[in-house]
A protein has these predicted regions:
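Juxta-kinase regulatory segment immediately upstream of eukaryotic protein kinase catalytic domains
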Residues: 1-25
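Conserved ATP-binding subdomain of kinase catalytic cores across diverse folds
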Residues: 24-46, 50-160
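Loop-centered beta-sheet repeat module
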Residues: 163-167
Length: 167
């Protein structure tokens, strides 16, 4: 067992996982959180070390995720399943913050898209997600990144970046 595995195994074992942890390895190409694939003798999980510089209010972040996933689940929509810690919390808070989800089999994450069909399908999936949330009470959510969903500001920032990109 590598030092990487030993360090993260102790973290993973703080969660209510099914089975004994048999392997932990880096997973994906994320740019914000450190993501690991945790394998037990019964199933697989995704464990993330949450970037608290990006998400300093981890309580709000996880509360938001739980509100949205619970709302979707009540509608019969397949969604993320947050795995609680052994003491019933939705994430582990210590020197670092960690969360665990069930691993969703047969899924793909793209860092870049060159295929028009994949791009089209991602737009459709996002539209379906928005549609599922149409009746969700957004006032329950806490802003975790200031003005992140401020489309006019984001578009103005985008245009300014384009204008500044002189070749």
């Amino acid at each position: 067992m590598t030092d990487f595995t030993k360090d993260y195994k102790a973290v993973a074992e703080q969660f209510a996982l099914e089975g004994e942890v048999t392997d932990i390895r880096p997973y994906g190409e994320g740019h914000i959180n450190v993501t690991m694939l945790v394998t037990t003798d019964k199933k697989r999980y995704i464990m993330q070390k949450i970037n608290t510089r990006v998400f300093p209010d981890t309580d709000a972040l996880m509360r938001n995720i739980c509100y949205v996933t619970e709302f979707l689940r009540k509608q019969g929509v397949e969604t993320l399943n947050v795995i609680a810690t052994k003491d019933g919390k939705n994430y582990l808070k210590g020197e670092n913050c960690y969360r665990v989800y069930d691993f969703i089999e047969n899924t793909i994450t793209y860092q870049t898209v060159t295929d028009k069909e994949v791009f089209k399908n991602s737009g459709k999936a996002f539209g379906e997600f928005q549609n599922y949330l149409a009746a969700f009470d957004a006032s329950l959510l806490t802003e975790t990144i200031a003005r992140f969903h401020d489309t006019p500001k984001r578009f103005a920032d985008f245009k300014a970046a384009l204008e500044a990109d002189v070749k």
